Swiss-Prot record:
Superkingdom as given in the UniProt entry: Eukaryota
Location(s) in or outside the cell: Nucleus
InterPro entries: DMTF1_DNA-bind_reg (IPR051651), Homeodomain-like_sf (IPR009057), SANT/Myb (IPR001005)
Gene from which this protein is expressed: eta2
Record organism: Schizosaccharomyces pombe (strain 972 / ATCC 24843) (Fission yeast)
Protein name in UniProt: DNA-binding protein eta2
GO terms of biological process kind: termination of RNA polymerase I transcription
């Protein structure tokens, strides 16, 4: 059932200065109390003296505020507007006009309807200025809340989120009422539904029903087309159309286990329990800065289809603070059945609650006690990249930058070929210039953050390989350059001749470097100064205990050893 409270304006000559005082009307199931206006079946205005009117007034007349109520909350109506603010109200409407007898009659009718019917929402329509009405309503709430008489107070029941057979019957009953009140035949309705602008023609009706059922208008329009068997919709299962629009984001059992593992790790690092973690999630004043690290880690581990907003919503619902008595509220068999259903369906709480005969909130409150913790291997497997995933990632980056970067340069990056460059940043795209959300969506198995990190790791590895290859290339060139000078091998006779030259010059010298090598080069021009010095050093170092022996003595011993060898060796 839908209750609507309309605040409308009797128009006089289409000018704002001549507008009369607002009047109200309320309606339920087609019955209405008329106050100068007609409340139609699909919540639209039928204005008396319907002539030309300003565009701004037209726009304001179509505004609608929908209020959702929690159980046992009391709300007061005055002049057709809420005075006591509901916990999840979107906006408030009000008027500065004094309360009239008509207003009081409407308020009384509203109170009786809510007391006697399982209503779940109230629609308030107003044509007054939005900003001024909200301001007036807030001031009225502050000043008048305690002064409103108890006769103008009532309790409203909370809306159920799950799509049940009762909701389906209710929706079909509203469709039948629409046909009856509007005197529309079934054939005429089919003609309306076949029109591509059917949503606009039935906008008021769909808005009213959608606000009660908590479903999208497009989904309900599909339901109507399937119900009336409009061409192209005959084979659609009308029983599943509204259910497909589950308001809860679905997490698999493995996803839930990974979340539990990360949350427990966070609690361990922060030194808090799950109850305190729930307070941090539910209260912005207790929100801890390290929560961002928790979100980032979960986004890296969970599928790309799950947004940050979805993760936050899951954490708030599953880990909200609980009364200690709720810990053992369920039997062990019920908890096992809950685990089995989540394993089969994921976290589709509405469907699971129907099968367990309880509420979605109760299922969510107990889920933390049975989800358990995932193994470390599960998280490690989600973090690791396979060769196929890495190759696909690089191909996606390569294809997205094909027009901006030379193919050969990109190929050398992604295949790790021998490709030297003095400035790698000029050769490959920077990490912050890549649309990682698009890359992640195409890859399908990793989050945008994980893709970015893996790409940066690849760049770092490539840069390191490039530097090593460049260093090795320089060494090869240097060795090749030395070989090009015609370097010859030292035979025993050559080494003996070298040491004899050194022996004549060493005298009291204590180091090979103190020898006049330029003079020796003149005597042995086939070798360079560096080559002769290196050969002499090696020959002296071959003498046992040469470090503790005078240079002249070491040279003498080396000469003696060389003379015992064949000269052509």
């Amino acid at each position: 059932m839908m209750l609507a409270i309309d605040m409308t304006i009797n128009e006089n000559q289409g000018t704002r200065s001549n507008l009369e005082s607002p009047t109200l009307s309320c309606s339920s199931k087609g019955a209405m109390q008329e106050r100068d206006v007609m409340f139609t079946d699909h919540n639209t205005f039928n204005i008396t003296n319907n002539k030309s009117r300003p565009g701004s007034l037209m726009k304001s007349m179509k505004r609608k505020d929908v209020y959702e109520f929690d159980e046992d909350n009391e709300f007061e109506f005055e002049m057709g507007s809420l005075i006591h603010k509901p916990s999840r109200a979107h906006s408030l409407g009000g008027t500065s006009e004094p309360v009239s007898d008509d207003h009081k009659d409407c308020m009384e009718a509203t109170r009786q309807l809510l007391e006697n019917s399982p209503l779940s929402s109230v629609v308030v329509k107003t044509c007054s200025d939005h900003a001024s009405k909200r301001k007036i309503a807030r001031s009225s709430s502050d000043d008048s809340e305690s002064k409103v008489e108890s006769t103008n107070s009532f309790n409203a029941k909370k809306r159920k989120d799950a799509w049940t057979e009762e909701h389906e019957k209710w929706f079909q009953a509203r469709i039948d009422e629409l046909l009856t009140i509007r005197s529309i035949s079934r054939e005429q309705m089919i003609e309306i539904l076949e029109d591509e602008h059917a949503g606009s023609r039935l906008q008021g009706f769909l808005e009213s029903v959608a606000s009660f059922l908590n479903r999208k208008e497009n989904s309900l329009l599909k339901y109507m087309r399937a119900f009336f068997q409009v061409a192209g919709y005959e084979k659609i299962d009308i029983g599943s159309l509204a259910a497909e629009e589950d308001s809860q984001l679905n997490f698999s059992l493995e996803d839930a286990q990974v979340i539990q593992k990360v949350v427990l790790s966070y609690c361990n690092n922060e030194g808090v329990d799950l109850q305190e973690f729930g307070f941090r999630m539910s209260s912005s004043s207790l929100r801890h800065t390290n929560i961002n690290f928790l979100y980032n880690e979960l986004r890296e581990l969970l599928p790309t289809s799950i947004s940050r907003k979805g993760i936050i919503r899951y954490l708030k619902e599953i880990y909200k603070p609980l009364d200690p008595k709720d810990r053992n509220a369920w039997e062990e068999s019920e908890l096992k059945k809950l685990y089995t259903l989540v394993e089969q369906e994921g976290t589709r709480w509405n469907s699971i609650a129907n099968k367990l005969g309880t509420s979605p909130a109760a299922c969510m409150s107990q889920w933390r006690f049975v989800v358990g913790t995932s193994t470390q291997e599960t998280i490690d497997r989600r973090k690791l990249w396979t060769n196929e995933e890495e190759a696909k990632l690089l191909d996606l980056v390569k294809s997205s930058y094909r027009s901006s970067f030379h193919t050969k340069k990109m190929t050398s990056l992604f295949t790790h070929n021998n490709h030297t460059t003095s400035n790698i940043q000029r050769e490959i795209p920077a990490s912050d210039s890549i649309a990682w959300h698009s890359i992640s969506k195409k890859l399908g198995t990793k989050s945008p953050e994980s893709c970015r990190k893996q790409y940066e790791k690849t760049i770092a590895s490539y840069s390191s390989n490039q530097r090593q290859e460049e260093d090795q290339g320089k060494k090869r060139k240097k060795r090749k350059k030395k070989k090009s000078k015609g370097k010859r091998k030292f035979y025993v006779a050559d080494s003996l001749k070298l040491l004899e030259h050194v022996q004549r010059q060493c005298g009291e010298a204590i180091s090979i470097n103190a020898i006049d090598w330029k003079g020796i080069v003149k005597q042995m021009p086939k070798w360079s100064e560096e080559e002769l010095r290196a050969q002499a050093t090696n020959l002296v170092a071959s003498v046992r205990g040469w470090k503790k022996t005078r240079l002249s003595e070491s040279v003498r011993i080396a000469i003696t050893d060389l003379k015992s060898l064949p000269p052509d060796v």
